[in-house]
Amino acid sequence: MASGALGVGERINGVNLGNWLVLERWMKPGIFAASGEADEIWLHRATKSAELEALLTRHRDTYITEADFRNIAAHGCNLVRIPVPYFVFGDVPGHPGCTEYLDRAFDSAERAGLKILIDLHTVPGSQNGFDNGGLTGVVRWHHSPRAVAYALNVLACLARRYRDHAALFGIEAVSYTHLRAH
């Protein structure tokens, strides 16, 4: 893909980089094996801080690399969707952030001629009750003005941080919502 924005009418050929910054048990069950937990939030709660930091660092350093961005572009893609958790900035105790990986992704994508669609994949209290929402069996986010405000703030911070980066395509507000009473 040529550098610059995707144009009106230009076909988007993209891939999702799931399970990198938001863990999804069905994609890589081994990362959950020691704890037996069903989702990322409970994995974080069940794992000691130093162990969790080491586990996430090992996973994030190796699961998606600069070579993957080059390979994706070489296969004709022009966009990657990157799911991020609501604790992306590392400001939620017990949940290590991942902006350094997202920063690297933006630089790798730009070098490879790719655009990025950031996807806020989890929100406090979960938006769908599935592992991809971070918290299995719970859908409370939309009942909490505080949680909604927090998610909106994360989106605003992501927009401020990446708005001028040449690789930014857009930001997906909240992924896979299922707003039902719980």
Question: Which sequence ranges carry the predicted segments?
Answer:
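Aromatic- and acidic-residue-enriched segments that line the glycan-binding/catalytic groove
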Residues: R25-E37, P96, S126-H142
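N-terminal carbohydrate-binding accessory modules
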Residues: M1-C77
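An active-site-proximal structural segment forming one wall of the substrate-binding cleft
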Residues: R60, F69-A74, P96-H121, G133-G170
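Hydrophobic faces of well-ordered beta-strands that scaffold small-molecule active sites
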Residues: N13-V15, V80-I82, I116-I118, I171
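Aromatic-lined carbohydrate-binding/catalytic grooves of carbohydrate-active enzymes
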Residues: H75-P96
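Conserved small/polar residues in nucleotide/adenosyl-binding loops
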Residues: T177-H182
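Catalytic metal-binding/acid-base residues of hydrolase active sites
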Residues: L21, H121, V174
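Aromatic-lined carbohydrate-binding surfaces of glycoside hydrolases
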Residues: V84-D91, I116-L135
